[in-house]
Amino acid sequence: MARSLKKAPFVDDHLMKKVLAIIENKSPKRPIKTWSRRSTIYPEFIGLTFQVHNGHAFIDVFVTNDMVGHKLGEFAPTRTFNGHGADKGKK
């Protein structure tokens, strides 16, 4: 089910504060480390790099224009797919 149009997109407060601090200070664009996979990508995030936790390690995510409106967690996969079990004796 989609999010209601009455509500604004969700971003964790601590993440937004970090982004605004980087934008205001014009500081070097260091990666922002976050565990907030549920946060929606805003247009202010374009050009920034986030390190999103996937449960095991931090994955670098460089935000581009096409990613706006998606969640950060969509770009840091949590599972690895090794293929379906194959019969080794079958040819």
From Swiss-Prot:
Protein S19 forms a complex with S13 that binds strongly to the 16S ribosomal RNA. InterPro entries: Ribosomal_uS19, Ribosomal_uS19_bac-type, Ribosomal_uS19_CS, Ribosomal_uS19_SF. GO terms for cellular component: cytoplasm; small ribosomal subunit. It comes from Metamycoplasma hominis (strain ATCC 23114 / DSM 25592 / NBRC 14850 / NCTC 10111 / PG21) (Mycoplasma hominis). Coiled coil: none annotated. SUPFAM superfamilies: Ribosomal protein S19. GO terms for biological process: ribosomal small subunit assembly; translation. GO terms for molecular function: rRNA binding; structural constituent of ribosome. The gene is rpsS. Disulfide bonds: none annotated. This is Small ribosomal subunit protein uS19.
